[in-house]
Amino acid sequence: MLIILALGQMAVILSRSIDLSMASNLALSGMIVALTNAAFPWVPVPALMVLAAFCGLILGAFNGILVWLLGIPAIVVTLGTLTIFRGLIFVIAGGQWVNADAFTPSFVQLTRYEILGLPLLSWYAILVVIGFYLMMTRTPLGRAIYAIGVNPNASVYAGIDVGRTKFIAFCISGMLSGFCG
């Protein structure tokens, strides 16, 4: 799963920013999903995975909005949200550990399931790597992320909205962090 986190960070770094809150985003998204699984055991695992990615997307969008609209440097924003997200984890969990006994068997077995000799999580990573590669090399968004990283001023003259592209990079980073959670 580290490769998925690295891809999210790559999108942000290529846009001349940094996201220090990825681990906290992962932890908060994971905590929300774990508590959801414990409280609502009838929710299927794929829905929980979508919930995790969506939670991460919202947290990444929060970072992106602060960087884009308020113009706060990314290192300051993500250092602050790192602490905020960690605090939210503590508040949501009530300061307690979440026990694996509270989870459904299908949720716990997700990491142990294998297809063609590879763990299911490895297949997820392979699919994300392929999708990320295609996005970065074959779409206008991918080229825009590269362009603003090379020269933001020239990117503006080329018609690229630098702030919006950075916002999307933070959303991608957040979504991938949440998915890993």
Each model region followed by its residue ranges:
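Transmembrane helix-bundle core of multi-pass membrane transporters
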Residues: 75-139, 165-167
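Alpha-helical transmembrane segments of multi-pass membrane proteins, especially transporters
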Residues: 22-30, 48-56, 74, 78-82, ...
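A cytosolic-side transmembrane-helix exit/cap motif
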Residues: 12, 43-49, 69-73, 93-103
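Membrane-helix interface segments
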Residues: 20, 41-47, 74-75, 141
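Helix-loop-helix "hairpin" substructures at the membrane interface of multi-pass membrane proteins
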Residues: 44-52, 58-63, 67, 115-181
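Single transmembrane alpha-helix segments in multi-pass membrane proteins
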Residues: 1-41, 65-72
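Membrane-interface helix caps of multi-pass small-molecule transporters
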Residues: 11, 35, 40, 58-69, ...
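Small-residue-rich segments of transmembrane alpha-helices in multi-pass membrane proteins
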Residues: 1, 30-34, 80-89, 157
